[in-house]
From Swiss-Prot:
Residues the record lists as N5-methylglutamine modifications: Q249
Domain of life: Bacteria
Major localization class: cytoplasm
Name listed for the protein in its UniProt record: Peptide chain release factor 2
Species: Streptococcus pyogenes serotype M5 (strain Manfredo)
HAMAP family: Rel_fac_2
Family: Belongs to the prokaryotic/mitochondrial release factor family.
Length: 365
């Protein structure tokens, strides 16, 4: 690395540290740490063991952020000092480059912890795809999205499982529900929630005309045992049906598929992946709890948005991302303006750039 490159890298690192400091609000962070430490010294702190463990975990996370920031600051200062000494001692160049590499690695990991710091970002995720109107063309678009997300999940180390699959009449899907199991699944996939628009020459149109199709994607965190969502048995209607794989493969001779309807809200969920009715009911119940929790969070968000004003609704006319196959190739996120011309790579699951851009946009917004 040339000295000019090293100087530029040091300037960029200082700018990043300034951004980290601003987003962290160190003064507030110090106050929060002090409050939690004082709380933990109270005589009755451990009377509620679950609450105490939660507080202890929160304190460790805050201290981790605080200590890591100061470690980065010290490493950055040391790097600057080495640069000043480089004119007198060329042998310091190797140590300087090692410091820069170490700082880059720490900053990259630290940036991810800041981007994924919202509640439930670390949870597993449930993702649903619902094609819009448009028949076979729209249902095929839903199937392409299913393939994209499955490949993304597999490439990034997630365990991907189909919870429910409703095949299209001629091709594609009517709906599909997937689970993603692994660290930060919800935090990463929440960027995909919204309407996805496709523009292409339809393979189902003999006249080879250009078609526009839509599909909506819903993403929910899979709730763990620390979050309670009350669902009364009287509020649930359960139907059973024969389940099978995509395209009707392996159709069961007994009714193992389960469909749950939450009567007060009208929410419907179903699971067909398990070989037993009991297993599918358990999976469907988890999906229902996640949907009810999301519904409650959306209500709270709407109340806040009503106070803020200027809330843009997610409708078929306000897609979050467009995938253009013709007359040119381009995938563009309309929230962040991040775009890629390599449509094939995106459809093969390479959506990390869109996710990173969204997470940074959320922090800046």
């Amino acid at each position: 690395m040339e000295v000019a490159e090293i100087r530029q890298k040091i300037v960029e690192n200082k700018e990043k540290l300034t951004s980290f400091r601003r987003s962290l609000d160190l003064d507030r962070l110090e106050e929060e740490i002090a409050l939690l430490e004082n709380h933990m010294t109270e005589p009755d702190f451990w009377n509620d063991n679950i609450a105490a463990q939660k507080t202890s975990q929160e304190l460790n996370e805050l201290k981790g952020k605080y200590d890591t920031f100061h470690n980065m600051q010290e490493l950055s200062d040391e790097t600057e000092l080495l640069l000043e000494m480089l004119d007198e001692d060329d042998s310091l160049k190797e140590e300087l480059e090692e410091n820069l590499m170490q700082l880059d690695k720490i900053m990259g990991a630290y940036e991810m912890t800041l981007l994924l710091s919202e509640p439930y970002d670390h949870n597993n995720a449930i993702l649903e795809i619902h094609p819009g109107s448009g028949g076979t063309e729209a249902q095929d678009w839903g199937d392409l999205l299913l393939r994209m997300y499955t490949r993304f999940g597999n490439a990034n180390g997630f365990k991907v499982e189909v919870l429910d699959y409703q095949a299209g009449d001629e091709a594609g899907i009517k709906s599909v529900t997937l689970s993603f199991e692994g660290p930060n699944a919800y935090g990463l996939l929440k960027s995909e929630m919204g309407v996805h628009r496709l523009v292409r020459i339809s393979p189902f149109d003999s006249a080879k005309r250009r078609h526009t199709s839509f599909a909506s994607v819903e993403v929910m965190p899979e709730l763990d045992n620390t979050i309670e969502v009350e669902v009364r048995d009287d509020d649930i209607k359960m139907d059973t049906f024969r389940s099978g794989g995509a395209g009707g493969q392996n159709v069961n001779k007994v009714s193992t598929g389960v469909r749950l309807t939450h009567i007060p809200t009208g929410i419907v969920v179903s699971s067909t992946v398990d070989r037993t009715q009991y297993g599918n009911r358990d999976r469907a119940m988890k999906m229902l709890q996640a949907k009810l929790y999301q519904l409650e969070q959306e209500k709270k968000a709407q109340e806040v948005d009503a106070l803020k004003g200027d809330k843009k609704e997610i409708t078929w006319g306000s897609q979050i991302r467009s995938y253009v196959f013709t007359p040119y190739t381009m995938v563009k996120d309309h929230r962040t303006n991040f775009e890629l011309a390599q449509v094939d790579k995106v459809m093969d699951g390479e959506i990390n750039g869109f996710i990173d851009a969204y997470l940074k946009w959320r922090i800046e917004d």
